[in-house]
Swiss-Prot record:
One of its GO terms (cellular component) is cell division site. It comes from Schizosaccharomyces pombe (strain 972 / ATCC 24843) (Fission yeast). This is Uncharacterized protein C16C4.02c. The keyword Repressor does not apply. Disulfide bonds: none annotated. Coiled coil: none annotated. The modification Phosphoserine is found at S19, S25. Keywords: Phosphoprotein.
Length: 548
């Protein structure tokens, strides 16, 4: 560990002391350069002499030097304190193991005075000292560092660039990050927004849950009318990308969401770039639901139209890019967020279709449906073209744009039977992605199997499904889910041990979905599969008997 020399220098002879008032005064002309040369020479004489001693003598010498150092540090005059810091820097460079002893005996009041000084040299010295000691995690999490945070933030208001390395160091540990976040209200209300957001982002990212700190942040932005600023959007876009909804949202801030939503509405109306707005909107929708967030049906129609246009305008350039890492990453990210928003709104539309059909004018409702139909027609063309133009299918299947496109497309296909014939042209892709999900943890099986029962009612789609022997992937998935569920126990033992309060296991839900698809495909599947041992499990045996 390297301890900096604290920026002290030799100066002319002649020393005077300095009071606390002088140290903080605007008129203070006492600079670190005015340290006595005699004092500095004495320090070097002592340290040089110590370096020439043997191992035991070196230890004794360093301890003697340490005692001399702290005698000067706690002296009444400030000149002695400055000299002691020169000694301390030299001592810690030679003996870094003494850092904890030095921190325990540090003159904290003097350190605070340095941080609050009106002279840059003193502030620089104080920040350097604090940063050097905070390089040790145990010191970083100490009570004395916690007590310095208020002073550091006051210093940071005047010397932001000087203090930000210490802020970043504090933010590197969850405990010390909380020391900073204790002052969330002060930070968001007193600092320029860009600086406040940088401090808060650094500190928040050290934690797993940030609910506690969201309300004062919302209130501070509201108080200072900062909702429309680009830095505000960047802050929330980054925050929501980093944390899942449950990590930042609580009912306590529901009432504070409206100003942010109003700013999002304005962005959708006026801005060409929807990147930040879609990230924020998707998270607000997941947190509070469309009914609470959407100001009116007109805005919902606007959002669907703009997101659809954003996606359709970008898919062409992404056909080849999805097979090349890093290419058009920003565009892919925006497209994914647009799909995310559309998925949430499609669910809302499906769940409230009758009510919305009565509320929304027929021509606008038709316009909304046409917009989505055209989008997903283009989405299927994109998937077909991307598949045919990229040989590395595993990379393609793992690309965020493909994942988002398939997830939202399958949701839409559960409702729109007019596009089943076109969807039949993706049968090879669906089968591949379903199998791909087994080893890569992507929910393709879940998404495709939800849409499949509806699509199988279409003759064109059913024929394509039959031609690809796609029933095999459904049955293989059913067996795999059962194997995963059983582990070392029998399947029935697993079912009996499942706690209903914990909710249904996703693998069990998938197995049940596969079962119902197999029943629907009874005319396609070989009848011999119904004789497999899996159907002797009481759970499936009962289901099978009730369906035949």
């Amino acid at each position: 560990m390297h301890i900096p020399h604290f920026h002290l220098h030799k100066g002319p002879k002649g020393v005077r002391t300095i009071s606390y008032e002088q140290l903080l005064s605007e008129d203070d002309s006492y600079a670190s350069e005015k340290l006595s040369e005699d004092h500095v020479t004495e320090v070097h004489f002592v340290t040089d002499k110590d370096e020439d001693s043997n191992a035991s003598g070196e230890s004794r010498g360093s301890m003697e030097l340490l005692e001399n150092c702290f005698s000067l540090l706690h002296a009444q005059d400030d000149t002695s304190k400055f000299v002691s810091l020169t000694m301390l820097a030299k001592l810690l460079n030679d003996h870094p193991n003494l850092i904890f002893k030095c921190w325990e005996r540090m003159d904290m009041k003097f350190l605070d005075r340095l941080l609050l000084s009106t002279h840059y040299e003193y502030v620089d010295l104080g920040v350097s000292i604090l940063l050097a000691f905070c390089s040790e995690e145990a010191i970083l999490r100490s009570y004395e560092v916690k007590k310095r945070v208020s002073t550091l933030l006051q210093c940071c208001l005047k010397h932001y660039d000087l203090c930000i390395p210490v802020i970043c160091t504090l933010s590197s540990n969850p405990k010390s990050a909380k020391y900073l976040l204790y002052y969330t209200s002060f930070i968001i209300n007193e600092f320029p927004f860009e600086q406040a957001f940088e401090i808060l982002s650094n500190a928040l990212y050290a934690l797993d849950n940030v609910q506690t700190y969201m309300r004062p942040i919302f209130q501070g932005i509201d108080k200072r009318r900062g909702w429309k600023l680009d830095c505000t959007f960047s802050f929330f876009s980054d925050l929501f990308s980093r944390f899942p909804v449950q990590s930042w949202y609580s009912e306590a801030i529901r009432a504070n969401l409206q100003p942010l939503m109003d700013a999002v509405v304005e962005r959708f109306i006026t801005d060409k770039n929807l990147s930040s707005a879609t990230v924020i909107l998707s998270n607000l929708l997941k947190a509070a639901g469309p009914a609470s967030i959407m100001p009116n049906d007109g805005f919902m129609i606007l959002v669907i139209g703009r997101c659809s246009a954003e996606i359709r305008g970008s898919l062409g350039m992404l056909v080849k890019a999805v097979g090349q890492k890093g290419k058009h990453g920003t565009v892919s990210y925006t497209v994914c967020e647009c799909y995310e928003v559309l998925g949430l709104l499609i669910r809302y539309l499906c769940e409230n279709c009758d009510v919305l059909a009565q509320r929304i004018e027929p021509d606008k409702f038709f316009q909304l449906q046409r917009s989505l139909t055209e989008l997903f027609s283009d989405t299927m063309d994109f998937l077909r073209d991307a598949w045919d133009n990229n040989k590395n299918r595993d990379n393609l299947a793992s690309h965020v744009t493909v994942i988002s496109a398939v997830a939202t497309l399958c949701l839409w296909l559960t409702e729109d039977d007019s596009q089943y014939a076109q969807a039949s042209g993706l049968m090879d892709i669906f089968v591949y992605l379903w199998r791909h999900s087994w080893s890569n943890g992507i929910d393709y099986a879940k998404w495709i199997s939800v849409a499949l029962p509806s699509m199988l009612s279409n003759k064109v789609f059913f024929k394509a499904f039959k031609d690809f022997d796609a029933w095999k992937v459904v049955y293989d998935d059913f067996i795999k889910c059962n194997d995963d569920l059983k582990g070392d126990k029998s399947f029935n033992d697993y079912i009996l041990s499942t706690n209903e309060e914990d909710g249904e296991d996703e693998r069990l839900a998938q197995a049940i979905q596969d079962f119902h698809i197999l029943i629907q495909l009874n005319s396609l599947v070989p009848q011999s599969i119904w004789n497999d041992d899996i159907w002797q499990e009481p759970y499936w045996k009962n289901l099978l008997e009730s369906n035949f």
